[in-house]
Structures are given as structure tokens and as C-alpha cells.
A protein has these predicted regions:
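Alpha-helical transmembrane signal-anchor/signal-peptide segments
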Residues: 84-103
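Active-site nucleophile-His-acid catalytic modules used for acyl/amide transfer and hydrolysis
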Residues: 202-250
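Membrane-embedded alpha-helical segments of integral membrane proteins
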Residues: 14-57
Length: 250
């Protein structure tokens, strides 16, 4: 009696887990159809209707039920094969990928963002070339910026400081194409590339404090020069790699 009860309870739990897995996969796959398939806003309704029918007829038409597991699997395979590309029209704030050239101790950074802002959305877009001396790399600051008073959410940035007073700020962000708005859900479906922005502090930091009115805090990182150089060179490698191997943000 006791074993029979446990057996039935185990089977019931397995069915619940199977249904939960099917539902989760189906919902996730609906996002793939919506965001990644041509005509997705229309096709997603056909997908939802087909999956609902398969669920409703799972006892009468077990073949349909089994096939409904294969559809999300096929969409997953399709999703994993979608390549990132740099060949899009990008919004001005993310229009150029920076590059870092290192010749001995000379650092040449191209396409450093140095915008002149009048408001958050009204600005003169400027990309410049900056030169630094690797041997003069001295400090690393960690910036934390909170928006809309949300202390539990923040955007983080870095700023590399040099002995001659120069700074090079770094921010890892989503690269938005023209006509596309920021969003957490689209980001889960390969809608945004990742971009490492290299910029003047007057651009990255002032944009947030002076125009977006965010609360920003700056912390000096305790790091020796050898590891500081390694960190800089590591970021430089990642930044340069995006020219040939673009990646998604998520």
C-alpha cells in the first residue's frame, strides 16, 4: 500500500515536471519565433495555436504531443546558429567599434568617443584618436552608476588613469541598431550586440551625472602596475576581437 502510494506520487511529480518543462520550453521558443524569424509577430500566433492544440489533444493524438517537443528543439538549434554581425546601421552612440594598437609602450586608441552634450539626446557626435604611454598606466577606478533611484541596479564602468593626468574610460554596453529601443526581453533573443566603448570621462561619466541625473560613485581599485597592465591588455584584446568576431550581449 505504502509503495503503491509512493509510486503514484512519483509518477504524478514526474508528470508535473514534464508539463512545466514543456511549458517553459514552449514559451521560450515563442520568443525565438517573435524576435528571430521573418514575420515573427504574425507567425508567433500560429505557433501558439499549434502548441495549444498539441497540448489539448495530447491524450487523443499522442503523435502531436510528441511532435510538440520537437518544435522547441528545432527552434533552439536555429537560435544557436544565428551569427552576430557588424553589418547594421547603428545608433550614433554605438556607431563605431574602438580599436587599440600597441607598439612597444605606445598605445594608440582609435574611435574614442568624445561627444559634446547639450542634453541626453542632443549632442555632437565626435570620435577621436588618443595616444597613451603604457609605462605611465598608474590607476584603475571602478564606477558604479544608479538610475531612477534604484540602489539595487547599477551600470558599472572602468577608468584607466595615467601619470600625465590622462584617463581612458571603458563601458560594456548593448550596441543598438537604428530604430531599436533598449529592452531586457529582446536582449535574451540575440537582438543586441555587445560593444566595449572607450571614451573620455567627460563623455561617459558626465552623460550619466549631468544629463541623466544618475547617482554615480567612483572607487579606486588597489592593484599593482603589473596586474594593471595585464588587465588593460586583456580588455584591448577583447575590444579588437569584436571587429572580426562580433558577439551578442547575452
Amino acid at each position: 500500500m505504502h509503495l503503491t502510494f509512493l509510486r503514484h506520487a512519483g509518477l504524478a511529480a514526474a508528470r508535473i515536471l514534464m508539463m512545466a518543462a514543456w511549458f517553459g520550453l514552449s514559451v521560450w521558443a515563442a520568443g525565438v519565433v517573435f524576435y528571430n524569424v521573418w514575420g515573427g509577430p504574425v507567425l508567433v500566433w500560429l505557433y501558439v495555436a499549434a502548441m495549444a492544440c498539441a497540448f489539448a489533444l495530447r491524450r487523443k493524438r499522442p503523435v502531436l504531443w510528441r511532435a510538440s517537443w520537437g518544435v522547441p528543439a528545432l527552434l533552439l538549434a536555429y537560435y544557436l546558429c544565428i551569427p552576430a554581425t557588424n553589418d547594421k546601421e547603428w545608433q550614433p552612440s554605438w556607431s563605431r567599434l574602438p580599436s587599440v594598437e600597441i607598439n612597444g609602450n605606445e598605445i594608440v586608441v582609435k574611435d574614442v568617443r568624445s561627444f559634446i552634450y547639450r542634453t541626453e539626446r542632443d549632442f555632437d557626435a565626435r570620435y577621436v584618436t588618443r595616444r597613451f604611454d603604457l609605462d605611465k598606466l598608474a590607476t584603475l577606478d571602478f564606477a558604479v552608476s544608479h538610475w531612477d533611484g534604484m540602489e539595487f541596479v547599477a551600470h558599472t564602468m572602468l577608468s584607466f588613469g595615467f601619470e600625465d593626468g590622462k584617463h581612458l574610460a571603458l563601458s560594456v554596453e548593448t550596441r543598438l541598431p537604428e530604430g531599436v529601443e533598449q529592452g531586457s526581453v529582446p536582449g535574451l533573443y540575440k537582438q543586441f550586440n555587445v560593444i566595449y566603448i572607450l571614451a573620455d570621462e567627460e563623455d561617459l561619466f558626465a552623460l550619466r551625472t549631468n544629463y541623466r541625473k544618475e547617482d554615480m560613485y567612483l572607487y579606486r581599485i588597489n592593484i599593482d602596475r603589473e596586474n594593471l597592465k595585464k588587465a588593460f591588455l586583456g580588455f584591448a584584446e577583447k575590444i579588437n576581437s569584436l571587429h572580426e568576431r562580433p558577439r551578442y550581449y547575452h
